[in-house]
């Protein structure tokens, strides 16, 4: 008794039964017009005009014709094979059980659906439609290749005696149509009908398992694996498919066990393992396996090289990449392979060797679109935007290739950055015109573009309209929020994504939204910005559970998050646990110690970094100078500045000069800072250095140099509000209220708006935001009342408000009211009222903490007996028992 397939459904009949055949005079395919003359005269005339060789071959036997037909199919002369069949029909030679399978194979390889249907009608006419299982199996294959799932099922359902080939054809077809569950159901029915599976069956079934979501796919895959072991069917073909399945499902340990236990490892086996390792970001291990493969005497091919080169690219292992390039050059024409060429271009560009990438590109004769895309992306990621756009134009105009979604992923960022491309949004119109606007890859790129242009609302609109969002889409939108400093929105979107992922794990969806390393390294800066320590710890726990905590990018982000949430000890612990530290990791930990005022530890880390063979870069020294500045280590900072080129090989840039100006200015050595400004190379951008000098002038009330710095800054950066605010502060402190008012008026006329002071504090699962002078928070009235009470207690302890921080020329009591509404005071009050006694209060602020808030927080910490950690835009302040960790040096 046959097994009723679980996926049975009703379809309209698309194949006429013999009694319903249409007359052959209708709906003819051009090939078959010759085979259906209306009279003997037309028969001869058609034959003479279309195939004069027929008269020569009329004496040939039917067997000769059928052998001729089959030989043409074997020789891949597909169209000639069809014409041979036409000649047979004209001569009245009846096709048999051997002719139709060969003919149907030819039509399947041609992927000609219309011709296939006509031949199918002939099959019924000559009586092979139901009883000949061989012909029926070939028909299944025909409709699979022509992409007609309904026809595949219909033909299969009418096979009276299904054999192994019938089931193999069906299961293979279902996999081709990505009907993975149905393929497994068909496999079960095959077993129920006592049809013995072959190795080809198991390959298709394992492929189906690899495309099911976890844990279902893994469970089914293991069952098929066990079945193969029991039946002794595990040949190299199946082993390779199992290795690929375990790798795709993230079970690399099982892939490696299979590889180790399999004696007949061939090139395909190795390539499968290498590909799985790279897909699962086990890049160093992939390179180790490549070495083992070569030692076993297995020569890499183009698939090996193109699979492993991305590992060199991501790890920036230029030397290994060059070795693979040399191997490709040495071994035949591997370097001429388009996939290898594209991978080489990507590797060189990712290692900042753009010229080497271009040489590979120029040396390729067969430049497919993948190669063009790799070179455009290489230029774009290295910010060679002009070259990227020129190459894009050349690809379309000279090479005649049309841009696809991958092309646009490289072109769009180049357009956004390029000064020559003023109408940035016009690229969106180009995408729509090319019909690429519904492509998910392109939509992700457009979302990123609008985020970087500051139009996060348009990015969100694109995201909202997308029907098919994958993990990359969610990561892109989260990145957009983080880039635009919409940190609360980024965390909310992550929460929404996690809720959808829970539905995925319950089988409600097939698209996995499980956060990966990119998700974590993207969202952790938002936790840091909001000082959301609890959320950061939650993400850290997830990273540990999913073996992502030791990833260098995730690890570096965790180091930064803990440091910016005030947990320097935990930051160092995470740093020490990262197995492969890169220069970014070292820079982050040095910056962390600097933010906390531990300058000597930062310098010790610089030395340790050198001992471990990691060369410092430009950012390293910015971190070191910042650490020296916040710790008052002026002489040590100057010493490092003057030896950074001879001892470390790093040329001082404008950013380094700005840091050293800050170092000197913060220490009150403003004239020296001004002299250093004048020593800067003429072509350097001096905005950063002038800004440091202006800030120092504000701290030390140096009106003369402050005015010079502000005038130069406003000329260089007329739209930056902080320059006007600092100058107005200097004038206010000096009692020059008219000048302060004039600065504010100029600021207003220029359309420059001061960024409002914002502070954040985490409580429970929420991050609460406070804005200076804002009363929209639900506890606003309660907080104001508490601060008034606290104010009186502080006065009794000797607190005198520093009203020099108020820019407005108003009465002293009004200035005090304005000071009381500063955002950090509101956040601290919220923390005191909403947490239990003894709990550390952690607050983050978007601007530099003012003198009065710094003074007030010292008094508050003593009165309420709380430790208060306040992070402003520059550094950390740890208040305890009336003192601050900065020693009033900030």
From Swiss-Prot:
Q: Name one GO biological process term.
A: mRNA processing
Compartment(s) where it occurs, according to its Swiss-Prot or TrEMBL record: Plastid, Chloroplast
Q: Where in this protein does the record put region Type DYW motif? A: 796-890
Q: Which GO terms describe its cellular component?
A: chloroplast
- Provide the residue intervals of the PPR repeats: 61-95, 96-130, 132-162, 163-197, 198-231, 235-265, 266-300, 301-335, 337-371, 372-398, 404-438, 439-473, 474-504, 516-550, 551-581, 582-616, 617-652, 653-683
- Give the residue ranges for region: Type E(+) motif: 765-795
**Entry keyword set:** Chloroplast, mRNA processing, Plastid, Repeat, Transit peptide
Transit peptide start-stop: 1-44
Region listing for Type E motif, in residue ranges: 689-764
| Effect of deleting the gene | No visible phenotype under normal growth conditions.
In the record, the note on similarity to other proteins reads: Belongs to the PPR family. PCMP-H subfamily.
Job of this protein:
Involved in RNA editing events in chloroplasts. Required for the editing of a single site in ndhB and ndhF transcripts, which are two plastid-encoded subunits of the chloroplast NAD(P)H dehydrogenase (NDH) complex. Required for the editing of a single site in psbZ. Required for optimal activity of the NDH complex of the photosynthetic electron transport chain.
Q: What is this protein called?
A: Pentatricopeptide repeat-containing protein At3g57430, chloroplastic
The species is: Arabidopsis thaliana
